[in-house]
Amino acid sequence: MPSVSVWVRSLAPMTTWTRAAIGALGEDLAVKHLDSLGMRVLERNWRCRYGELDVIAEDPAARAVVFVEVKTRTTDHFGGVVQAVTPQKVRRLRRLAGLWLAGRDERWAAVRIDVIGVRIGRQATPEITHLTGVA
């Protein structure tokens, strides 16, 4: 598989993309980032009536299940990844994580919520910011 920067450069110009397509690209890049850290993705886009979890991964080094919120931006007009994680968002993620865990038999030593910000701009390489353990 080509590097992330080569892969992104081979895509159509960003001006023709929908918000959903940009979000999906951000999630794909976040998953590649998690893979590079040795994490194993358990599920993507898990939904229930209360909302959606973008990525659920396992961190074998920490024996933890990690719920990852992915925020993709093409500009800085709406703030960075830190501004995107409001107390309400954290409460929602905790609730959704609890619901996902309730439906599983497997147990982990730790549960963590991470946020990955993906900034896709004119640069050849997307900027990835990974905030670990926000809740």
Curated annotation (Swiss-Prot):
Signal peptide: none annotated. One of its GO terms (molecular function) is nucleic acid binding. Belongs to the UPF0102 family. This is UPF0102 protein Mjls_1965.
